[in-house]
Structure formats: C-alpha cells, structure tokens
Amino acid sequence: MINKQKVNKIVNLIGFLSLNLQRKIQNIKVMKRSNIKVMKRSLIVGTYLLSLVCSCASEGTLDNGKPLSLMEDSKNMVEMAQLFAPLSMVALDEKQSDKLKWISKIDYVNGRYYVLGGLERGKLITFDSKGKFLMDIGDIGHASGEYVQASDFAIDKANNRIAILEAPNKVLLYDMNGKFLFEKYFKKISFWNIAWNNNEYILSTNNFGIQEKDKLLYVYDENFNLKNSYVDNLPYTIGMSNVLATPLQVDGNDVNYIDPVTKGIYTYKSKVADAQRTYKWLLPNPMPDKDYVHYKTFAENQYRYDFILDAVVDENRILTSYKRGDYMFVNLMTRSGMSKTFGHIDVSLPKLIKGSGRYVFLAIRGREYLKDKAYFTKYKKDINNNDGYLIFKCKLK
C-alpha cells in the first residue's frame, strides 16, 4: 500500500504522465486496425510509466444511474457534420498558436476566448472574438501569483474573476485583466479539475484518494470556504488525472463529472445541494474498475475490454467516444438513452471540450483540417496550411 508521504511525492509526476497520456488518447485515428495498434503502443507506454509509481486499487459501491447503452455493433461510418453543428470558427493568432503544442480547455465568456495550452507546461491565454491575442493570465514560475503548470481554470462570472488550478493543491485567483488577487492552498486533498457555477467552485479529485474518507466532488463558496463534499472516492485508489479533456462540465444549473473508470456521469445539483450518479454506460465487455484504475493492469488488459475514451453532455444530448472490440466508436444520444447517430468515425476525433456555456469546442490545426475531407467543409475556403489552431464553437446535433 502506498503511504501518504509517498503519495505526496509522486502526485506531480502522475499528473504530468497522465496529461501526456490524455494527449495520446485524444488524438487517435479511429478507423483502421493499424491505427488501433498505434493506439495500443501509445497507451502501453503511458500506462507502463504510471505503473512504476502506483499500486493498490479497489472497487467502490455506487448508485446505478440511468442506463446509456453502448451495446449495439455497427458498420456505419459517422462524419463530423452528423455530430456537430458549427456556429463559428476563428483562427488563433499565428505567433501565439505556434506556442501551443496542445490545447486542453477552451471557454468563451463576454467576447473572449480563454485557451489553456502550451508546449510542455500549461498556460492560460486570452484572445478576442476574432482570435487576436490579448494577454496571458499569470506567468509560469514559483513566485507569488505564478504557477508551475496550469492544470485547469474556471471563470467566476459573478465576481469577475479567473480561477486557475495548479494541481494538485493550489488555486490562484486573478481579475479579468490578469491582475493577481490571492491564492488558496489545499493541504490534505488533491484536486485535478475545477468548475464555477451559481457562485460556487466545484473541484474534483478524479478518484485520487489519499485517505479512505476522501470524496470525488468538493464544493466551496466564493471565498473558498468548504460547503460540502459528495460521492465516495474509490477506496485506497491512486486514480490518474482523468483522460478526458473536460471531465468536470457545467450543464446549466448543474455540474457533471464524467468518470470513465466507473462508467458513469455524476451530477452536482446546487439547488438541492446534492450529487449522485445520474447515468451509467453499458458496454458489452467493460473493463473492471480495479483494472482501469490500476495502471499496470490497464496496460495489460486494455485489448481485452471495452472502455470510455471521451464524453460531453450538452443540454439534451450526450456524445460518447469509446473503444469497443478492436474499433473506436462514437454515439450521440438523447438523455433518455436513445441513440441518434452511432458508428465508426473516419477522422481523428478532436478532444471534446465543454465550455461553461452551451457550447462544445473543437481545436483543430489548419493543416489537419484541410487534409481530412470529413471535417466541416463550409470553412475550407478561409483556411490555409500555415494556419495554426482553429477553434470551432459547436452545438451537438
């Protein structure tokens, strides 16, 4: 069993490795078996490294939630236009885009794009509605108001503040012009994602439980006083930071946590101050919880089982990408669990990035967009190979 001191030493390493694993998983080419083999090699490398620092996993007792069936097989090919209705597209400032090797989160608030990404370490960058660079929020460093790596962020719309999470134990607050205000340290809990909604901050441990009593979701007021915590962590588990781009998603008055380990969606409802599992994915051959959260067994058994890759909830739609057998599938369904579109997808599915509003963002480089005919065609004439990141603001079909 890993003791608490050892956990504190390895937590940053786990975050770094799992972030790199997330990037590998989210850029899988999902059609051919040869591409599946590439995915397998990538997953093995990431999970093997993580297995060197982790051990001990155990299943927890959870509520059932409404079933979302992914049991059907299909030979149908799905195109992006069947899943997303693009509302707008902007090309990010070329100089700034060149500094972004990856993008992990996007939001659009009051005419500004907030983009979390970087070369090696994450940084929060702002752009105007046309993609012109405005400013960085905070700097990378160790001084007051600086962060080693921005892991996640949230926009506090009530108090006009920007909260940046430096996992696992610090949140930095800035005003909307990037002026540093204050920071909050968490001594005994490891957090990996943050959201703001209804004047509350919601932080998730992503099943990274150090103590048996740790919870999955913690709710704080505007001054970061703890209000309550919900949903038991999987006991004695060292869970990796979630491989989804945005596992913690604002959904109107609710906040959803997407958990591929337990194959569920957990919903925090601020109006009733409660959280529970609201949905449960059903797969033909699901990976057991104990294998999913233990990196070594995940690497050894990933070929044998089906598992969730990514998901986003947007109003009355749920979009899921998942491995089933030897192939990658997507399934767009209603909240009642009725499938609208599902099958293989013949394009590299970008990360599904849920903003705080009713939008899903896709970040695609110009050359990738032009290379693949399956992407939205109506913007082709406006793009060239030298364009960096293109940000598509979409609704689910």
Give the ranges of each region predicted by the language model.
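Repeated scaffold domains used in trafficking and secretory/extracellular systems
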Residues: 101-105, 148-153, 189-196, 238-247, ...
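Short coil/turn segments at the loop-to-beta-strand junctions that recur within blades
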Residues: 96, 138-146, 186-192, 233-238, ...
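Short beta-strand elements that form the blades of beta-propeller/WD-repeat-like
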Residues: 112-117, 160-166, 199-210, 251-266, ...
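Blade-loop segments of beta-propeller domains
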Residues: 93-97, 132-159
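Conserved blade-ending motifs and adjacent loop-strand segments that build the rim/top face
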Residues: 278-300, 335-357
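Asp-box/WD-like beta-propeller blade repeats and closely related beta-sheet repeat scaffolds
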Residues: 167-198, 203-211, 230-235
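Beta-strand-rich domains and repeat architectures in extracellular enzymes and scaffolds
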Residues: 88-120
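Blade/loop signatures of beta-propeller domains
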Residues: 60-92
